Amino acid sequence: MAKPTISPGMQQYLDIKENYPDAFLLFRMGDFYELFYDDAVKAAQILEISLTSRNKNAEKPIPMAGVPYHSAQQYIDVLVELGYKVAIAEQMEDPKKAVGVVKREVVQVVTPGTVVESTKPDSANNFLVAIDSQDQQTFGLAYMDVSTGEFQATLLTDFESVRSEILNLKAREIVVGYQLTDEKNHLLTKQMNLLLSYEDERLNDIHLIDEQLTDLEISAAEKLLQYVHRTQKRELSHLQKVVHYEIKDYLQMSYATKNSLDLLENARTSKKHGSLYWLLDETKTAMGTRMLRTWIDRPLVSMNRIKERQDIIQVFLDYFFERNDLTESLKGVYDIERLASRVSFGKANPKDLLQLGQTLSQIPRIKMILQSFNQPELDIIVNKIDTMPELESLINTAIAPEAQATITEGNIIKSGFDKQLDNYRTVMREGTGWIADIEAKERAASGIGTLKIDYNKKDGYYFHVTNSNLSLVPEHFFRKATLKNSERYGTAELAKIEGEMLEAREQSSNLEYDIFMRVRAQVESYIKRLQELAKTIATVDVLQSLAVVAENYHYVRPKFNDQHQIKIKNGRHATVEKVMGVQEYIPNSIYFDSQTDIQLITGPNMSGKSTYMRQLALTVIMAQMGGFVSADEVDLPVFDAIFTRIGAADDLISGQSTFMVEMMEANQAVKRASDKSLILFDELGRGTATYDGMALAQSIIEYIHDRVRAKTMFATHYHELTDLSEQLTRLVNVHVATLERDGEVTFLHKIESGPADKSYGIHVAKIAGLPIDLLDRATDILSQLEADAVQLIVSPSQEAVTADLNEELDSEKQQGQLSLFEEPSNAGRVIEELEAIDIMNLTPMQAMNAIFDLKKLL
């Protein structure tokens, strides 16, 4: 049987596809991007496009699917959003001039981590992460946002830190520079749903790589660079020099902690609404929005940097009218970072340059407004603002205000910018008049009253003559086309004018394109200055945003202390307050003196324990961002980390139960926390048997108290734990107050000193709407259980009353009354001392001394 032959075009496709086996290959053929073989079958299903075949009559037709080139971006977006790579093969020569098969090559590979263009633009960062290791114990991690040029690297000492940083960066694609174990591969691909791309080669760019980085950081950064250049197929002038950062330079929080605190999105809805980001976002620019997210994600630990931000916010609060002018001016600023990156990618169109020009037109006014504050705190910012008047002049002089996005259809360069272009336009403009003159002249000479000149791409300019007037056609007319009811004619004069006009049009279009490319190249030389300007404007935008929020919600400037004390007077949970309204929210004060490390919080479910704990965390985060906070007065230490376990949730992806997740997060806290950390644990230990959970909860509290010394809030439903305050000197009990009247319970949402006396679980069930008969039965059972408990504690048998102390203890154990806490280690000695006292020969003074000595033993 003869081997089926493959056409040269399909052979070209197969040769290119061989180099991109892990990507969908979009193969440009005329006005379509075609996909073949398995790519076509899969793409047709995913994109819901028609699946056809090439060579339908062949024994084995080749599956084929295609999308129009002008709408391809929306299909690329769908594939990339689902985690696929897309290789784009373009025609590299004019098909009309090609000899043989049109030359094609891949010009870009779009991956989840390298998206620059999208039909659904998003102001958020899109980070591509690279990791490398020599011993799988220490790791270099580098990340980049290809759309903005941001490039950073750090060194991490364990894989859990790598995992946490990847989650915090919300990366979707990881470039791996070493051989992963099966376990780590499964973790990244299956549990974290990441696209992995392996890269062995390194690209050393002396302009981007800082030699002061560690070897692993350099390796990760260079492999990341190599991957980006290999997929983007071009020099990227907008990439910034890699910046080293340390995790410890910021307030450390795990992804789970940020999620439980609803920092960047509401954990229940995965939406912005209801998050801290939603509350604080009064930014007016895309760069400011990204920077605000970064500030929330990475609060500071440097007191000086925090105070620098506070000082500027205070200035913005003190000068309302100037700040209002500043806010209005920021509205006219486009996304400088991404416009600069589009220039670097060679994708910037006339509209992009117009937006950049309009932005640069606003910068002098923004600088002038900042100067008008006349405050030294703003001097550094003012001095950083580079107005670049020559670039603004170039763009606004060269690009026509009405220019569209396309760069090949003309009308993009302003009149007066280029003399030759103006000449071509004059020919085209006057040519229209010349044609009108020819039409009038020939109509009069021929006597054909309906004679007119029309135009189409096939025949060019022609005289339109109906059949009834064919006898009047002059001899110098020559036929160009015959139709059913008319004919088309040309003349030498018309052809000459047409030639001049078409040449002028073609030359004009080509010249406009060349001029635009030259202008864009000049803009590219300003990219680094534009990026610095973007950072400065973003900083101004975030600071004014925090000032606006502080003013709207009456926030105060927090103070900081070195005495490890927390003082929050009438604090509020910032986002809950915004949802409920200031008038409805019940504030709570929080106090930890230098001798208090742990608050043990008891109270009914739904009474506000979790809100109280989150209130403290959000106050710390907002304060260490440099912002103002929701309270009447705040004085805090600077924390180095926040650890939380708030809210129950199984980890369904990895198959871990609530209790396992609790223990893992507790492990992270007790191992990584320092005496400068904040720990928030809500109902820890509820996922196992009562005594197991209680024992673990107590041991964790003791461990934190004795060894970690971190400021800790520990909410619990184990009321027995409140007795710990008698043993642990730096633990205090607080509870959520309730009002019980006529069988009805009101949660006051107010924190008070001391332990709670009841849990009110049945009342919560009533609020939830459980059936009345079920609740009545629960009340009866509770009464019986409480009666039994009282009997065990206060009504021992008559025999036990008359027995000695040791027999009484044994009797309690036999009845099932377990002691949660160990008996004091001196109990036996106290008993011995009591038994040794001769009561009949004891003077009053000796009795007092004996009591004093016994008290010291307790």
UniProtKB/Swiss-Prot annotation:
The organism encoding this protein is Streptococcus agalactiae serotype V (strain ATCC BAA-611 / 2603 V/R)
Under the heading SMART domains, the entry gives:
MUTSac, MUTSd
- What is the stated purpose of this protein? This protein is involved in the repair of mismatches in DNA. It is possible that it carries out the mismatch recognition step. This protein has a weak ATPase activity.
Any single GO molecular-function term of the entry would be:
ATP binding
Any Pfam family from its record, for instance, is MutS_I
In terms of superkingdom, the source organism counts as: Bacteria
The record's section on CDD domains has:
ABC_MutS1 (cd03284)
Q: Name one GO cellular component term.
A: cytosol
The text of the family note is: Belongs to the DNA mismatch repair MutS family.
What are the recorded Gene Ontology BP terms?
mismatch repair
By its UniProt entry, which PANTHER family does this protein fall under?
Answer: DNA MISMATCH REPAIR PROTEIN MSH1, MITOCHONDRIAL, DNA MISMATCH REPAIR PROTEIN MUTS FAMILY MEMBER
Q: Does the keyword Transcription regulation apply?
A: no
Q: Which keywords fit this entry according to its UniProt record?
A: ATP-binding, DNA damage, DNA repair, DNA-binding, Nucleotide-binding
Provide the protein name: DNA mismatch repair protein MutS
Q: Please list the residues that bind ATP.
A: 603-610
